Curated annotation (Swiss-Prot):
Record-listed E.C. numbers: 6.1.1.6
NCBIfam families in UniProt: lysS_bact, PRK00484.1
Gene encoding the protein: lysS
Keywords: Aminoacyl-tRNA synthetase, ATP-binding, Cytoplasm, Ligase, Magnesium, Metal-binding, Nucleotide-binding, Protein biosynthesis
Name the UniProt record assigns to this protein: Lysine--tRNA ligase
Compartmental location: Cytoplasm
Gene Ontology terms, MF aspect: ATP binding; lysine-tRNA ligase activity; magnesium ion binding; tRNA binding
BP GO terms, sorted: lysyl-tRNA aminoacylation
Cofactor comment: Binds 3 Mg(2+) ions per subunit.
Catalytic activity line of the entry: tRNA(Lys) + L-lysine + ATP = L-lysyl-tRNA(Lys) + AMP + diphosphate
Cellular component GO terms, alphabetical: cytosol
Binding site for Mg(2+) 2: E422
Record text on subunit structure and interactions: Homodimer.
Organism phylogeny: Bacteria, Pseudomonadati, Pseudomonadota, Gammaproteobacteria, Enterobacterales
Residues that, per the record, bind Mg(2+) 1: E415, E422
Species this chain originates from: Edwardsiella ictaluri (strain 93-146)
Length: 505
């Protein structure tokens, strides 16, 4: 047995012994009929106490004589004979408890409290005071065991240094790591701020189907399921776009949805097969209006949630108080690869040679627009560190976007990038039903040629367009990638509570 295996065996034995001792304590509680009480009520949380009383002196607290009831997990305990100090952790943070034998009834201190374990859920009532070292604390006059923890806190044995354990057992990560708790508190605040921003702009929040007969709205491989009662295959949605635009046809001229999308694709630091998107659609607007709205959205969220328009991400600094950089796709390619001539990108043979020199494998179904897009992905995308709008996407890779009036090869579309990754996508919507039908046919041909990410033909959506879609602009924002930026997280798993993981054997 190696030294590492020996250490692992010893840790497992220690854990088993610890759990056995805790189970015996629980058995005693069951025998007394007080194993899992549910009659304790708290009236405040640690963060509220710190907010209200951190500025109060010892004398002021004594004069106020504030009685409180708190509950949470016992994280640390220092027993000093007839008195102990406990660190209690709740959703808002931590507060210190002072527990003295003479302040409790019926020998609770010796017979109960001293036998409790770290990780147990407890409730306490007492008076606020400040210790000799100046720490805000609660002088307890009653304390109760609410839930017996059978497993020890994660850091007692092997800790949570293993990233996979943090993702698989997020509850342990949240118990042990304040940084993780803060990340998800920030995520919640950002979602609330986004909704507030959208409502203030006159948008109505809606919900559209998560299971669809025809998946649409994006080029991606869908998950397939089966509806037993209807006896039909259905798809988990890859995007809500076509349903949201049906609502615009119906007269809801400003709509948005924040919800999950599902794409049967790989997992990476940037990709999770189940992810959160916000999509919005606004009638009587174009992609240029979306650019202004996007800049305002990021500026507002940054200012309202983080308190500044300047965001630090790794060693990069983003100032959302400034306009984003703007350039076309071809301009970006030539900017980051000056050796590539813009004119060559408009020639299929020359563009294919450029792509092949970059290691791009050309598929038979690709046209010039797809080749250009692949060249952009290879040469420019990772270089777009500062907030940047890339415009003039080819129609071939934009089957739902309106063609440009001056150049029908391209569309009135942008994607925006921050930190070298795509964050969102917006365009003036295609509202020509006949053009949309033709583009769906092109997608069907691409699918027949082997492109399993090509779109399906959605006949009902074409019918909806035939009833008249007002001039409309639509935007999609990757919420998880947005969260990565605003929480300085460098993998998408750090901002998704329960990311996709391969099952353990």
């Amino acid at each position: 047995m190696s030294e590492q295996q020996q250490q692992g065996a010893e840790q497992a034995l220690d854990l088993n012994n610890e759990m056995q001792a805790r189970r015996e304590k629980l058995a005693a509680l069951r025998k007394e009929g007080i194993a899992f009480p549910n009659d304790f009520r708290r009236d405040t949380t640690s963060d509220k106490l710190h907010s209200l009383y951190d500025g109060k002196s010892k004398e002021e607290l004594e004069a106020l004589n504030v009685e409180v009831s708190v509950a949470g997990r016992m994280m640390t305990r220092r027993i000093m004979g007839k008195a102990s100090f406990v660190t209690l952790q709740d959703m808002g943070g931590r507060i210190q408890l002072y527990v003295a034998r003479d302040d409790l009834k019926d020998d609770v201190y010796s017979e109960q409290f001293k036998k409790w374990d770290l990780g147990d859920i407890i409730g306490a009532r007492g008076t606020l005071f400040r210790t000799q070292t100046g720490e805000l604390s609660i002088h307890c006059h009653s304390i109760h065991l609410l839930t017996k923890a059978l497993r020890p806190l994660p850091d007692k044995f092997h800790g949570l240094s293993d990233q996979e354990t943090r993702y698989r057992q997020r509850y342990l990560d949240l118990i042990a790591n304040e940084s993780s708790r803060e990340t998800f508190r920030t995520r919640s605040k950002i979602l609330a701020a986004i909704r507030n921003f959208m409502v203030n702009k006159g948008f109505m929040e809606v919900e559209t189907p998560m299971m669809q007969v025809i998946p649409g709205g994006a080029s991606a491989r869908p998950f397939i399921t089966h509806h037993n009662a209807l006896d039909i295959d259905m798809y988990l949605r890859i995007a809500p776009e076509l349903y949201l635009k049906r609502l615009v046809v119906g007269g809801f001229e400003r709509v948005f949805e924040i919800n999950r999308n599902f794409r049967n694709e790989g997992v990476s630091p940037r990709h999770n097969p189940e992810f959160t998107m916000m999509e919005l659609y606004m009638a009587y607007a174009d992609y240029k209006d979306l650019i202004v709205l996007t800049e305002e959205l990021f500026r507002t969220i940054s200012q309202d949630v983080l308190g500044s328009s300047v965001v630090q991400y790794g060693d990069q600094t983003f100032d959302f108080g400034k306009p984003f950089i703007k350039m076309s796709m071809k301009e970006a390619i030539c900017h980051y690869r000056p050796d590539i001539a813009s004119a060559d990108l408009d020639d299929m043979d020359k563009a294919c040679k450029i792509a092949e020199s970059l290691g791009i494998k050309i598929e038979k179904s690709w046209g010039l627009g797809r080749v250009q897009c692949e060249i952009f992905d290879e040469t420019a995308e990772s270089q777009l560190i500062q907030p940047t709008f890339i415009t003039e996407y080819p129609a071939e890779v934009s089957p739902l976007a309106r063609r440009n009036d001056d150049n029908p090869f391209i569309t009135d579309r942008f994607e925006f990038f921050i930190g070298g990754r795509e964050i969102g996508n917006g365009f003036s919507e295609l509202n020509d039903a006949e053009d949309q039908a033709e583009r769906f046919q092109d997608q069907v041909k691409a699918k027949d040629a082997g492109d399993d990410e090509a779109m399906f033909y959605d006949e009902d959506y074409v019918t909806a367009l035939e009833h008249g879609l007002p001039p409309t602009a639509g935007l999609g924002v990757g919420i998880d990638r947005m969260m990565m930026l605003f929480t300085n997280s460098h993998t998408i798993r750090d901002v998704i509570l329960f990311p996709a993981m391969r099952p353990q054997k």
